[in-house]
Amino acid sequence: MEEFEPTIIAFVCNWCTYTAADLAGTSRLTYPKNVRLIRVMCTGMVDPQYIIKAFLEGADGVLVSGCHPGDCHYINGNYKARRRIKLLKEILPQFGFDQQRLRLTWIGASDGIQFAEIMRELVTQVKALGPSQAKLKMVI
């Protein structure tokens, strides 16, 4: 039997986290290949329905990552994201998903090392949770 490798969808801010991911790549830092980056202009633009859809389509974990509070290119986008993620974590169990499968982080543009570390940590955390229930239902 194959070892479970989780699928992680990461919504990343164009101005900070995506730049950190690029820096990690150019610095030849490694992070798991099962993390799929979706670049958004700001984490404040990530609608909760995109996160729920990612889970319903079989993602084992979702990351939303952007600029540190106070450093948002769009002034308050990361504050909006923080409020949305907090509310979404409260309702995820109603959809049958463990709230530990959703994570919000702040990664600055020059934090390539931190980006790679967070990706590895997230994959390890989600791997310990096992496959998402939506994915198990799709197989049946």
Question: What is each stretch, according to the model?
Answer:
Residues 1-140:
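Iron-sulfur-associated redox domains of electron-transfer enzymes in respiratory
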